Amino acid sequence: MISVKNISKSYKSVRALSGFSYDFERGIYAILGPNGSGKSTLMNIMTGNLKADGGTVTVGEGGEMPDYMFGYCPQYPGMYPNFTAYEMLDYIGILKNAENREKQIERFIEIFELGEYKNKRVGALSGGTKQRLAIAQAFMGAPELVILDEPTAGLDPLQRINVKNFLAEQGKKTAIIVSTHIVSDVENIAHEVIMLKKGKITLGGSLADVLSRVDGKCFTASAEHISQNFEGIYRLCGADMRIVADKLPFEGAKLVSPELEDVYLSVFGMGDDI
């Protein structure tokens, strides 16, 4: 178990994190929040790239986490441009003293469809290909904790699905923390969800618990059935749903279970980034 206790961090007068505490075990943890909520600050502290003003990050009974125990894919991954994709994976494997290094490399090359790029220099790769390579690097050496900051940035829809399926499988044996603006990337695979706002946990718990925080069911309505008075509204939850329910034609609306995006919008509002 990786335990984060009372982490705080300020940048001059701006409080980025305020008393963040959470325990991370095997499974997928989605950290959601608008820009400036403290997500990247938290991840940089957990990886040792940034010093907290206060608090601790410990493993097990209280020891510090060795570098080989975690993998990290930053939002803007840095790589050696003159290395080939294969050499980058090999280099990370050596640093982590990975067992069966060559087998791991070949496995990730296949999973992330890097075969045609493995002998090409990193500096010549596209942004999406570099991103897939960065995710593969994070899992080299079978770390106990993997931290992914906006891992699907620059990936096309099919690649995002591939990454999502990979994470779902890896989450059975690894603690994975994913920070993302793309809610659909973690919905249905996250075991726990943490919503951050201004450096504090606004909502946290299992996915089922978080989804239950929305007041009741949701209404959906196709555009052709929405009256001009509600132009642009396609999904309503809780109290909002009850207000307009009697104004929608019965055949044009239906009850559905809330989704993670509904919870996000109920916590942060329509004006925040998703």
Q: Residues of each region from the PLM?
A:
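Conserved ABC ATPase "signature" region
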Residues: 90, 100-117
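Conserved ABC ATPase signature
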Residues: 121-125
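Catalytic Walker B motif of ABC-type/P-loop ATPase nucleotide-binding domains
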Residues: 146-150, 155
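Helix-to-loop junction immediately C-terminal to a conserved catalytic motif
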Residues: 47
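Conserved ABC transporter NBD signature motif
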Residues: 54-68
